[in-house]
Curated annotation (Swiss-Prot):
Belongs to the PMP outer membrane protein family. The lineage of its organism: Bacteria, Pseudomonadati, Chlamydiota, Chlamydiia, Chlamydiales. It is found in: Secreted, Cell wall; Cell outer membrane. It is a peripheral membrane protein. Residues 1-17 form the signal peptide. Keywords: Cell outer membrane, Cell wall, Membrane, Secreted, Signal, Transmembrane, Transmembrane beta strand. Coiled coil: none annotated. InterPro entries: Autotransporte_beta, Autotransporte_beta_dom_sf, Polymorphic_membr_middle, POMP_repeat. This is Probable outer membrane protein pmp15. One of its GO terms (cellular component) is extracellular region.
Length: 938
C-alpha cells in the first residue's frame, strides 16, 4: 500500500543531470501518515524536532517530494526508521541544498527493518548550480547508523553535486550487523572536485559484522568514486563477500587542498580485517591516484581471499599511498586466511599506450610490509613501484608466522606487452626477506637498490630476474647505484618451470648504465650469492613428482649470472652439493652440475650484451626409481583386502550350527564386527565396523551329513588412523557348510565354503604439505574355506562337556584394477592377492541347563597360528607423474588368541534365540564379533 499525504501541491519539473530525462515532481509539505487526520504544517521539515518511522506493517513510500531547502522528503533533528515489517522506500525526491530524500540535523538511525531503499533522489534542482552545500543525494546526517536490518538495503541512482552521491555524514557512518545484503550502486557526485560517489563520511566509516553481502558498485565522483572517508575506514568481520567494483574517480585537477584519486575508495587510514568470504576490488578507475584504493595507510590482515583485479589509474593501478598530511604512510598486506591477488591492474603515468601493469605506487617515506601465513600467498601478477625515497625498508614475510609465499609473476602479461615495466618491480630503497618464500616467476623481475636475505627462501622460476637498480636520494634527483648491494644466501630453483617448453634460466644481473641509447657496464653494485641451492616447485615443495624426471635429462639450465668485467658478483660460496643430499619423495636420481663461463666483448647497443662476464649453471639428471610420499602410498587401499577377509570370516561363523536334534531348520541372524588394526612398521592401521544380516537353512538327519546354506549382506565403513581417509563397503556373501560324524560320533567333521563380492568407495583426504582430496570406486572378490574337527566325548546326555577342536582356515582375496579422480589421483591394480592359511587349536566347553527355560552355554578358547601367508600387494601409479611403486598392506601378526562365549535359549519347543560374542586378540589386531540369531526347526 502506498501512503499519500495531503498538503499544498506545487507542480515542478527538473532535469536529471547528464541524463536528459525530465521527471514531473509533486511538492508535498506533509505529515507522517499517522497524523493525516490532524495535519501540522511544517512538521516533517523541522530541524528542531525528532521524527520516527516505526512499526509499519505495510509499505511506507515517500516519492516525488520536493522541499525548498534541506531534505526533499523529510527534515528533522533526529530520525529513527526502525522495526518496519513493510518495505520502506524513498524514491525520486529532490531538494536544492542537502539531503535529497532525508536531512537529519543530528543523527539518523535505520535499524531492524525489512527491505529499505533510496532510489533516484537528488540534491539541487539545477545540476549546474554551485551555490549551497549540495550534499547527500539520498541522505544527509551528522551521524548515521544502519544496523541490524533483516532485509535488503538499496541505495541506487542517487545524485549530489559536491559530496556523497547517496550517503553523506558530517562525522561518522556505521553499517553494522545487518542480516540482509546492502547495495550501493550507480550513485554520483558530479562536480569536478566532488567527494564520495556512493558514500561520504566526514570522519569515520565502519562496515562491520554484516551477514549479508555488501556491494558498492558503479558509483562515481571526482575523488573516492565508491567511498570517501576523511579519516578512517574499517571493513571488518563481515561474513559475506564485500565487493567494491566498477567505481570511478574522474578528477585530475590537482590543487593545494585537493589530491584526487581512489576509484574504489579514498581515506586516510584504511583497515580491512577478518572478512571471512573476502573482499573484491574489480575494475575501478581513477584519472589520478590509486585505481582501487587511495589511502595514507592500509592494513589488510586475517581475511579470506582479497582480490585487486582490472583496476586502473594514472599512478598506482590498484593502490597508492596518500602523501598529504603529517606522518608517514604504511601499507601492511598479510595473507592469513586466503590469498591476496593483484592481477591486470594498470597505470599510465609514463604515457604508455596501452598502460603498463602496476599494483602499487608509493610516495616518499612509505612503510611497505608484505607477508603470508603457511599455505597462503600474496600474488603480484602486476609489479610494484617503490621508487621515491623512504627510510623504511620493504619487509617480505615480516612476522614470525609468515612462512607462506610472496610471489611476483609475469604469467598473465599479454604477449604483446613486452615493455620491461610490465614485468619489473622497482624497489629503489632497502628490501629485506625475513622468512618464508619470496618467489619470482615467469619473466618477472625485482630491480633492487639494496636487498638482504635475512632468512627464508628466494624461489626463482623460468625467466625470473634479480637485478640492481639505482636509488633516488630526493624526489627530484637522478638515480644512483653507488652503495647498491644484493645479498642472497638461500636460492631455490622452480624446477618444473625450468623444464617447461622454451623456458629460460633465472638470471642474476648487474643492470647496465644507460646514457641516451648507449649501455655500459656498471661497476658500482655488488651481489653476493652463498648458501645452499635447492630445487622446489611453485608451491615450495619437492619437485620430484614431475613427469620430466622419469627419464634422463641433460644440460638443464638452472641459473644464469650476468656480471661485469670487474666481477662484482661473488658466487664462490654457493653450495651445489645439496642438490643430491637429503631425502625426498618422487623420482629418485642423481644431479651432476657444471658451470659454463663466457667472456664477451661489450655491446653498447644491447641491454644484456653490455655486460661481458656470463656464467651458466647446467645440470644433468640420471633417474634411479620412484619413492611415493607417505600420504600417496595407499596402504589403506591394500588394507581393504584384509577388511573383506575379516568380514568373510564373520560370514563363515554364521553357517555352523551344531544341533543334536534332527530335522530341518531356518535361522535369521544379525551380525556386527568391529576391527581395530594397529599401525605397524611405518604403515597406518585402520578401524572398521560392519553390520549386516544373514539367512540360513539347515537339513539334518541320522542317515546323511548335515547341510546348511546361507546368504548374507553386510555394510561396513573403515577409517584410516591419523588421517581422514575412509572407505564405505557393501558385501554380498553366500556359503555352505557340510557336517558329519566319524568313529561312532567321537569326531564331528565340518567343511565350510564361501564366496563374497564387495563393492567399495574410497575417499582420500590429503593434509600437511599435500592438499586436496580424491575418490574412487572398486570391487574385490573373497574366497573363504574352513575344515573343522571336533572331538566329542561320550555320552551326549552329560550337562557339562569339554572337548578339543582343531580348524584349518583359508582366505584368498583379489582386488580389481581402478583409477581415482580428483587431486593426486592414482591408479591401482593387483600385484599379489591376499592368501592366508591358519590353524586355530583350542578347547570348547558346553553346559546345559534343563530347567524351566532350557539354556546352553558354550565357551571356547583357541590359539591361531598362521601356516602360510602371502601378504597383498598392489601396483600403484601417480597419474600426474606416472611414477609407479608397490603398495603393501599394514603388517598383520601371524599368531592370535581367540575367545568365544555363546548362549542359546529355547523360548518355544521349536524356537531358540542365541547371542554369540567372540574376540580375536593379537599384537597387531583386535576384533569383536557379535551375532544375535533366531532359529526355528520344522
Amino acid at each position: 500500500m502506498r501512503f499519500f499525504c495531503f498538503g499544498m501541491l506545487l507542480p515542478f519539473t527538473f532535469v536529471l543531470a547528464n541524463e536528459g530525462l525530465q521527471l514531473p515532481l509533486e511538492t508535498y509539505i506533509t505529515l507522517s501518515p499517522e497524523y493525516q487526520a490532524a495535519p501540522q504544517v511544517g512538521f516533517t521539515h523541522n530541524q528542531n524536532q525528532d521524527l520516527a518511522i516505526v512499526g509499519n506493517h505495510n509499505d511506507f513510500i515517500l516519492d516525488y517530494k520536493y522541499y525548498r531547502s534541506n531534505g526533499g522528503a523529510l527534515t528533522c533533528k533526529n530520525l529513527l526508521i526502525s522495526e518496519n515489517i513493510g518495505n520502506v522506500f524513498f524514491e525520486k525526491n529532490v531538494c536544492p541544498n542537502s539531503g535529497g530524500a532525508i536531512y537529519a540535523a543530528q543523527n539518523c538511525t535505520i535499524s531492524k527493518n525489512q527491505n529499505y531503499a533510496f532510489t533516484t533522489n537528488l540534491v539541487s534542482d539545477n545540476p549546474t548550480a554551485t551555490a549551497g552545500s549540495l550534499l547527500g543525494g539520498a541522505l544527509f546526517a551528522i551521524n548515521c547508523s544502519i544496523t541490524n536490518n533483516l532485509g535488503q538495503g538499496t541505495f541506487v541512482d542517487n545524485l549530489a553535486l559536491n559530496k556523497g552521491g547517496a550517503l553523506y555524514t558530517e562525522t561518522n557512518l556505521s553499517i553494522k550487523d545487518n542480516k540482509g545484503p546492502i547495495i550501493i550502486k550507480q550513485n554520483r557526485a558530479l562536480n569536478s572536485d566532488s567527494l564520495g560517489g556512493g558514500i561520504y563520511s566526514g570522519n569515520s566509516l565502519n562496515i562491520e559484522g554484516n551477514s549479508g553481502a555488501i556491494q558498492i558498485t558503479s558509483n562515481s565522483s571526482g575523488s573516492g568514486g565508491g567511498i570517501f572517508s576523511t579519516q578512517t575506514l574499517t571493513i571488518s568481520s563481515n561474513k559475506k563477500l564485500i565487493e567494491i567494483s566498477e567505481n570511478s574517480a574522474f578528477a585530475n585537477n590537482y590543487g593545494s587542498n585537493f589530491n584526487p584519486g581512489g576509484g574504489g575508495l579514498t581515506t586516510t587510514f584504511c583497515t580491512i580485517l577478518n572478512n571471512r568470504e573476502g573482499v573484491l576490488f574489480n575494475n575501478n578507475q581513477s584519472q589520478s591516484n590509486g585505481g582501487a584504493i587511495h589511502a595514507k595507510s592500509i592494513i589488510i590482515k586475517e581475511n579470506g581471499p582479497v582480490y585487486f583485479l582490472n583496476n586502473t589509474a594514472t599512478r598506482g593501478g590498484a593502490l597508492l599511498n596518500l602523501s598529504a598530511g603529517s606522518g608517514n604512510g604504511s601499507f601492511i598486506l598479510s595473507a592469513d586466511n586466503g590469498d591476496i591477488i593483484f592481477n591486470n591492474n594498470t597505470a599510465s603515468k609514463h604515457a604508455l599506450n596501452p598502460p603498463y601493469r602496476n599494483a602499487i605506487h608509493s610516495t616518499p617515506n612509505m612503510n611497505l610490509q608484505i607477508g603470508a601465513r603457511p599455505g597462503y600467498r600474496v600474488l603480484f601478477y602486476d609489479p610494484i613501484e617503490h621508487e621515491l625515497p623512504s627510510s623504511f625498508p620493504i619487509l617480505f614475510n615480516f612476522e614470525t608466522g609468515h612462512t607462506g609465499t610472496v610471489l611476483f609473476s609475469g604469467e598473465h602479461v599479454h604477449q604483446n606487452f613486452t615493455d620491461e615495466m610490465n614485468f619489473f618491480s622497482y624497489l629503489r630503497n632497502t628490501s629485506e626477506l625475513r622468512q618464508g618464500v619470496l618467489a619470482v616467476e615467469d619473466g618477472a623481475g625485482l630491480a633492487c637498490y639494496k636487498f638482504f636475505q635475512r632468512g627464508g627462501t628466494l624461489l626463482l622460476g623460468q625467466g625470473a630476474v634479480i637485478t640492481t637498480a639505482g636509488t633516488i636520494p630526493t624526489p627530484s634527483s637522478t638515480p644512483t647505484t653507488v652503495g647498491s648491494t644484493i645479498t642472497l644466501n638461500h636460492i631455490a630453483i622452480d624446477l618444473p618451470s625450468i623444464l617447461s617448453f622454451q623456458a629460460q634460466a633465472p638470471k642474476i644481473w648487474i643492470y647496465p648504465t644507460k646514457t641516451g641509447s648507449t649501455y655500459t657496464e656498471d661497476s658500482n653494485p655488488t651481489i653476493t650469492i652463498s648458501g645452499t641451492l635447492t630445487l622446489r616447485n611453485s608451491n615450495n615443495e619437492d619437485p620430484y613428482d614431475s613427469l620430466d624426471l622419469s627419464h634422463s635429462l641433460e644440460k638443464v639450465p638452472l641459473l644464469y649470472i650476468v656480471d661485469v668485467a670487474a666481477q662484482k658478483i661473488n658466487s664462490s660460496q654457493l653450495d651445489l652439493s645439496t642438490l643430491n643430499s637429503g631425502e625426498h619423495y618422487g623420482y629418485q636420481g642423481i644431479w651432476s652440475t657444471y658451470w659454463v663461463e663466457t667472456t664477451t666483448i661489450t655491446n653498447p647497443t644491447s641491454l644484456l650484451g653490455a655486460n661481458t662476464k656470463h656464467k651458466l649453471l647446467y645440470a644433468n639428471w640420471s633417474p634411479l626409481g620412484y619413492r611415493p610420499h607417505p600420504e600417496r602410498r595407499g596402504e589403506f587401499i591394500t588394507n581393504a583386502l584384509w577388511q573383506s577377509a575379516y568380514t568373510a570370516l564373520a560370514g563363515l561363523h554364521s553357517l555352523s550350527s551344531w544341533d543334536e536334534e534332527k530335522g530341518h531348520a531356518a535361522s535369521l541372524q544379525g551380525i556386527g564386527l568391529l576391527v581395530h588394526q594397529k599401525d605397524k612398521n611405518g604403515f597406518k592401521g585402520f578401524r572398521s565396523h560392519m553390520t549386516g544380516y544373514s539367512a540360513t537353512t539347515e537339513a539334518t538327519s541320522s542317515q546323511s551329513p548335515n547341510f546348511s546354506l546361507g546368504f548374507a549382506q553386510f555394510f561396513s565403513k573403515a577409517k584410516e588412523h591419523e588421517s581422514q581417509n575412509s572407505t564405505s563397503s557393501h558385501h554380498y556373501f553366500s556359503g555352505m557348510c557340510i557336517e558329519n560324524t566319524l568313529f561312532k560320533e567321537w569326531i564331528r567333521l565340518s567343511v565350510s565354503l564361501a564366496y563374497m563380492f564387495t563393492s567399495e568407495h574410497t575417499h582420500t583426504m590429503y593434509q600437511g604439505l599435500l592438499e586436496g582430496n580424491s575418490q574412487g570406486s572398486f570391487h574385490n572378490h573373497t574366497l573363504a574355506g574352513a575344515l573343522s574337527c571336533v572331538f566329542l566325548p561320550q555320552p551326549h546326555g552329560e550337562s557339562l562337556q569339554i572337548y578339543p577342536f582343531i580348524t584349518a582356515l583359508a582366505i584368498r582375496g583379489n582386488l580389481a584394477a581402478f583409477q581415482e579422480s580428483g587431486d593426486h589421483a592414482r591408479e591401482f591394480s593387483l600385484h599379489r592377492p591376499l592368501t592366508d592359511v591358519s590353524l586355530p587349536v583350542g578347547i570348547r566347553a558346553s553346559w546345559k541347563n534343563h530347567h524351566r527355560v532350557p539354556l546352553v552355554w558354550l565357551t571356547e578358547i583357541s590359539y591361531r597360528s598362521t601356516l602360510y601367508r602371502q601378504d597383498p600387494e598392489l601396483h600403484s601409479k601417480l597419474l600426474i607423474s606416472q611414477g609407479t611403486w608397490t603398495t603393501q598392506a599394514t603388517p598383520v601378526t601371524y599368531n592370535a588368541l581367540g575367545i568365544k562365549v555363546k548362549n542359546t535359549m529355547q523360548v518355544f519347543p521349536k524356537v531358540t534365540l542365541s547371542l554369540d560374542y567372540s574376540a580375536d586378540i593379537s599384537s597387531s589386531t583386535l576384533s569383536h564379533y557379535l551375532n544375535v540369531a533366531s532359529r526355528m526347526r520344522f
